[in-house]
Amino acid sequence: MRTKAGKFRQDSYDENDKFAINKIQKYLLKKNFIIEEKDQEDFDIDIIAYKDGLKYRIEAEVKNTFFTDSGSYPFDTVSFLGRKKKYSNEGLFYYFLLCKKNNSFLYCTSDIIYQEKYKEIKEVNTVHRFGTDVFYRVPRQLCNFRTFNQ
């Protein structure tokens, strides 16, 4: 079933959400972050973590694009969902995109992503979505590329 662009898809959530969150949480724990546990899903920012007295807010998403680093990323820009901009109302957050096919991820901060100059309104027509959606296309050089082994 196709969903209107910009709307929540339960099937995509079920397939990707826990995978992405668990993968990032394990990575953060290895880096000595403390993860705030959620009692139940609140459909708010995915992860809240602390390190050295600082609070980090993190949104996790799976990207169907294959990459291992900036050089192998197949596009000049990285596309971030406009509907996640609401999380920046409470302040800066880190937006992580995971490559499910290997051990790589990229991230960028919301203050860089959600600038008007990167905003793009686009007609979407895929097997899963249709209609008008908002994206922010950030030059890949402004994103941080990593593997979970680093």
Task: For each feature predicted by the language model, list its residue ranges.
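Non-catalytic C-terminal interaction segments of nucleic acid-processing enzymes
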Residues: Y50, K100-Q150
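Conserved catalytic cores of phosphodiester-cleaving nucleases, focusing on short active-site segments
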Residues: L28, I47-A49, L54-F66
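Short solvent-exposed loop/turn micro-motifs enriched in small/polar/acidic residues
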Residues: Q40-D42, Y87-G91
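Mg2+/Mn2+-dependent nuclease catalytic core
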Residues: N64-Y87
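Hydrophobic/aromatic beta-strand patches that form the interior of the parallel beta-sheet core
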Residues: I58, F96-L97
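Acidic-basic catalytic patches of nuclease active cores, encompassing PD-(D/E)XK
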Residues: M1-D39
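Short, surface-exposed beta-edge/turn micro-motifs
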Residues: E90-Y95, N102-F105
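Active-site metal-binding core of divalent-cation-utilizing nuclease and nuclease-like domains
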Residues: I34-G53
